[in-house]
């Protein structure tokens, strides 16, 4: 996820597919330094959009099809830069099929897609939006394209669609408040299922530990075990370095 200041954001989001943007330069540098590392990238326009949304906005409405065309260009630029896994987190309709077709056409058939198929309009994203410079840019909210947190059946429908369109694996986001969704997804489809322990979840644990209310390491491991118990094959978490240190002694 690149940090993009307001001064570098535009209405046409052209920076998203610029081969020299921060994300693509980082991909090439990491690929050169650590050739065997698996690299995953985020595909959405929010970090390049002047209004902070994941798609183009016209007259206050997110324009789906025009956004999908841009997302394909963004995904191809990332694949060219060395990405192994493309992670569309935008929640536009039809973007998985379009990205898969684009990758195949550009001879990137080995690049995998992890679809953020069940991404909820959540209050847990706050610290992340601050970190990537999106909070000040965002106009309105994302409830017209991210999912209602009261709805569970829609997640199953969207995941079925994205797998049919060519996703290799799926993501549930946020994580801990949606363990029921993780379990349903894995039980229903058997596909590789991941959860994103988002910035708000991470920050709550860190803040409580800093105040002496909980044991950070124990709560961290317990929370991650909850994902595994729910059926997740992997977890994206900001605790990753700490977990690695703890598990490796």
Question: Whereabouts are the PLM-identified features?
Answer:
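Alpha/beta enzyme core
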Residues: 1-249
């Amino acid at each position: 996820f690149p940090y993009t200041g307001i001064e570098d954001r535009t209405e046409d989001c052209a920076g998203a597919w610029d081969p020299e943007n921060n994300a693509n330069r980082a991909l090439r540098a990491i690929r050169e330094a650590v050739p065997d590392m698996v690299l995953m990238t985020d595909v959405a326009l929010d970090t390049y959009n002047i209004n902070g949304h994941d798609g183009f906005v016209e007259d206050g409405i997110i324009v789906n099809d025009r956004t999908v065309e841009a997302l394909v260009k963004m995904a191809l630029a990332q694949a060219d830069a060395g990405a192994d896994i493309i992670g569309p987190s935008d929640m536009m309709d039809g973007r998985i099929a379009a990205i898969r077709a684009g990758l195949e056409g550009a001879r990137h058939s080995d690049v995998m897609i992890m679809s953020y198929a069940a991404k909820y309009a959540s209050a847990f994203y706050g610290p992340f939006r601050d970190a990537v410079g999106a909070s000040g840019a965002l106009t309105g909210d994302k409830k017209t394209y991210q999912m209602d947190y009261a709805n569970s059946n829609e997640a199953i429908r969207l995941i079925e669609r994205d797998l049919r369109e060519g996703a290799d694996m799926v993501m549930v986001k946020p994580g801990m408040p949606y363990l029921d969704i993780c379990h349903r997804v894995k039980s229903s489809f058997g596909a590789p299922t991941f959860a994103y322990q988002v910035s708000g979840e991470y920050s709550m644990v860190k803040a409580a530990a800093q105040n002496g209310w909980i044991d950070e390491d124990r709560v961290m491991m317990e929370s991650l075990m909850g994902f595994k118990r729910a059926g997740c094959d992997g977890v994206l978490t900001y605790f990753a370095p700490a977990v690695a240190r703890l598990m490796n002694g």
